Structure formats: C-alpha cells, structure tokens
UniProtKB/Swiss-Prot annotation:
One GO term describing the cellular component: cytosol
Top-level EC class: transferase
Gene Ontology molecular function terms on file: 16S rRNA (adenine(1518)-N(6)/adenine(1519)-N(6))-dimethyltransferase activity; RNA binding
Protein EC: 2.1.1.182
Major site of localization recorded for this protein: cytoplasm
Protein name: Ribosomal RNA small subunit methyltransferase A
Domain of life: Bacteria
Residues annotated for S-adenosyl-L-methionine binding in this entry: 27, 29, 54, 75, 100, 121
Alphabetically ordered keywords of this record: Cytoplasm, Methyltransferase, RNA-binding, rRNA processing, S-adenosyl-L-methionine, Transferase
Catalyzed reactions per annotation: adenosine(1518)/adenosine(1519) in 16S rRNA + 4 S-adenosyl-L-methionine = N(6)-dimethyladenosine(1518)/N(6)-dimethyladenosine(1519) in 16S rRNA + 4 S-adenosyl-L-homocysteine + 4 H(+)
Length: 274
C-alpha cells in the first residue's frame, strides 16, 4: 500500500516556498470547496477548544481560526510551524505547539469546562497509533474530525460480516461513535494521490455502552483473532481460553471473528479475566 502524508494547502506549494516531497508522499489539498466542507462539518464556535494536528501550510487553519476565539495547532515540522503566524488571520488567536502528536500529552490542553475538539489530516503510516494515542485522552475530548484514506475510514466504520470489519473497527467503536462524512477525490490534491480519501467524525463515549472487565485483554484478544481471521474462534484461541469459555459467553466456537459484534467480543474477552 502506498503511504500519503496529507498537508492541507489551498495555495500553490511552490509559491509558499514548500515543495511536495515524493519521499514523504506529500499531497496538498487545493480544493476550496473541500476545505469549506471540512470546516462546516467541524462547525467550530466561539469558546470551543479546537486543536489541529499537522496544520501544514494553514489552509484549514485559516478558516478555522476565523470561527474560533483561539486555536491550538500541533506541528512537528519546525519550518512549517515558524511560518504559521504569517499565513493566518488573527495570529493572536493562534497557539503553536511544536511537538510529535504521537507523544504529546493532549490532556494539558483540556479543561473540565472546555473539552478538546480535535481536527487533523493524518498520514496513513501513523494514523492507527495516533488514533489510539488520542483515545487515551477520550474523557477530555468532545469530538474528532480527521481525513484519511477512504479504505481506512471504511475499516473504522465497518460493521460485522463485512470484509472491512477488523481490529480497528472493534476497538475504535468500543471507545467512540464513528461517522463517515464524505469522500475527497484524488483530484482535490496536487499532485493527486492514487487513492480516494474520506473525512470522518469520532465522538468518544462519555459512558461506554459496553464495558469490558479488562480493556487490555479485549485489545489482545481482538488483535489476535483478526491476524487469523480465516480460522474459527476455537482454533484461533486455543490455549488462550478455558474449554467452557465459549459456552459461558454464549458464542459459537465455530464462528469466525468477522461475524462477532462488539458486545460478543467483550463477553469473550471477559472470560480471560479471573
């Protein structure tokens, strides 16, 4: 699979002094209609605690900051971070955090009165670990809006009994309510990537509708069975569960992992916990 790092830029990258680099797979979003649609989906309001991950050349940052009292951006590239105040209206509203989002403690940006609204265009190669890193701060996050390759978004929002359904589907849906919002065609980027992208929303549950006894056990079980998704649960989980675990969980041991609901995965993982 090709990896594309999305940096939003409604202008000509060369005019901005930043050339798309092939080795990083950078593709710059130039379609103003798509940018406007993203902002409408986020629907920022004065008083919102908005955090943008990877602002790049600020094409999304600019319309966002026009709707907010304040905007915090997390940018790893020092050169891009240094140029942001000159690229946005109301630079006095902008707070720039030069940090690796994968390691950053987002809790320090939130308060009880102002949970985070996180926005970003995530490169595929860090999207999964970054999503799970952000979920560590789920109790401090109101919602998240991201753009990724459509196939990844399809996996996040997938339902049981589909080929897209897997570990990412189960674990994201355990913590959040995901919503597929809209596709972004390759032609919206310069240069155009070879994949279609999509924008989606995640809303962390304030109270999870289904709670596992041990979330690490759930993650371990789900990850294990989907690495062997063609095997039956009995064969895949041999040695991990007691003989009567399937009966206690009310699950057919001959089923395959893609047929199980989130609730069934939780019931099965609970059998791993004394």
């Amino acid at each position: 699979m090709e990896v594309f790092m999305y940096q939003i830029n409604a202008l000509n990258p060369k005019e901005e002094g930043h050339k798309a680099r092939k080795r990083f797979g950078q593709n710059f979003l130039h379609d103003q209609r798509v940018i406007a649609k993203i902002v409408r989906s986020v629907n920022p309001r004065p008083g919102d605690n908005v955090v943008e991950i990877g602002p790049g050349l600020a094409a999304l940052t600019s319309p966002l900051i026009g709707e907010c009292d304040a905007l915090t951006v997390v940018e790893l590239d020092r050169d891009l971070a240094a140029g942001l105040p000159d690229r946005v209206p109301h630079p006095e509203r902008l707070t720039i955090v030069e940090a690796d989002a994968l390691k950053y403690d987002f809790s320090q940006l939130a308060t009880q009165e102002s949970p985070l609204r996180v926005v970003g265009n995530l490169p595929y190669n860090i999207s999964t670990p970054l999503l799970f890193h952000l979920l560590e701060f789920g109790d401090k996050v109101k919602d998240m809006h991201f753009m990724l390759q459509k196939e990844v978004v399809d996996r996040i929002t997938a339902e049981p009994n589909t080929k897209e359904y897997g570990r990412l589907s189960v674990m994201i849906q355990y913590f959040c309510q995901p919503t597929f919002l809209f596709e972004v065609p390759a032609g919206a980027f310069n240069p155009p990537p070879k994949v279609t992208s999509a924008v989606f929303r995640l809303v962390p549950y304030k109270e999870k509708p289904i709670v596992a006894k041990d979330e690490k056990a759930l993650s371990r079980l789900v990850g294990h069975v989907f690495t062997q998704r063609r095997k039956t649960l009995r064969n895949s989980l041999k040695g991990m569960l007691a003989d009567d675990a399937f009966d206690k969980a009310g699950i057919d041991p001959m089923a395959r992992p893609e047929t199980l609901t989130l609730a069934q995965f939780v019931a099965l993982s609970d059998q791993m916990v004394p």
